[in-house]
Amino acid sequence: MQMDINHFDFNLPVELIAQKKSKRSNLLIYNKQIRNIEIKPFEEIITYLSPNDCLIMNNTKVIPSRLKAFKTTGAKVELFVETIVSDKEAMVMTQSNHKLKLPATLVLESGENVLIEETSSTLIKKAYFKIKTNIESFLDLYGATPLPHYIKSDERLDPNYQTCYAKYSGAVAAPTAGLHFTNEILNTLPCPYDFITLHVGLGTFLPVKHNDIKQHVMHHEQYIITDQIIDLIKKTKQNSGRTIAVGTTSVRTLEDTWRQPQIIAGARNTDIFIHPGFQWQVVDGILTNFHLPKSTLFMLICSAIGTEEAHRCYQIAIEAKLNFYSYGDAMLII
C-alpha cells in the first residue's frame, strides 16, 4: 500500500524558520494518553519527568566539514566532508552551479589540490586531499559549520550549533534537540541520562523525492551504544519508567538496537526509516525540534503520535508562532 508524501505536507510560514539560537526556547508538550497540548518555557521540562524515567542523548560533535574549492576555470564548488577515511582520503558531497565532471581536480583555499572521483553512489564521492597536514587539521583551519541552507549565517564557525555535551567529533549536523539543554538544566533533571553517539550525516538534509514515501532509502549512519545504556533502559522498564529519546538520532539508534537479533552494545550502521506503520519497540517519549514539511523527521513524529495528531500539534505551534527547525523551539512527546 502506497503512502502519499502529500499527507506529510503543511503550510509553514518562512518567518517561523529560526535563523539563530534564541536565549530562551519554548516547549510544546504533547500527552499521548489524553491528547493534551501545553506550551511552556523549555526549562519547565523537569516538571514533566519522573525519577524512574531516563533520557538518552546524542553526544556527537559537529566538525567544520564545509570547504570552499574552485575548478580550474575559477568556478566555485562546495565540498561537504561526510566521512574521513584516512589522513588524506574522505567521502564527500559536492555542490556547484553546474554538474561536476569526474574525475576532477579542484583547488582548495590553501592553494593545495583535491581529486574528486566517482563511487557507486550518485551522491557521495571519493576525495583524495593533496595537502601537507591531515584532513581533520585542515578542516579546523579552513572548514566552516555546515549549516542547513535555510539558515543564513556569515560566521565560518557557529558556536551555537553545538550541544553543551558534545564530545566525539564526526557529525556534519548537530542533533538539534540537544541544543536546548544547558549544564544548569542537566544538573536539575530528576532522572538519569546517558549518551549514545551517532554522527549525523548529510543525508539528514536530503529530501524525499518519491510520491510514495516507502520508496525512499535512508542514508546510512553509524552509531555506538554501550552496555551501560542498555542496562539503564532495562532498569527503567522494570521500574515502569519511560525511555525518552532526545532527538531523532537517539530515536533511530535505540529502535535499531532493539531490532537486532540480540540487544547488545557495539557500533553499527543503520538506515532505519521510521514512518507511519512502524512498530515501536523501546522509545516511550521523544524530545525533538519542529521539522519541515514532507521531511523524514516529520514522518517519524507522525509515526509516534499519528499523522492527524502530528498535524494538529504543528498547527497549534504555528498559531503560537513557535520557531521551527535547527534553531527553533522544542516538542516533548510523552
Feature map (PLM): residue ranges:
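A cross-family signal for N-terminal binding/gating loops and helix N-caps
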Residues: 1-334
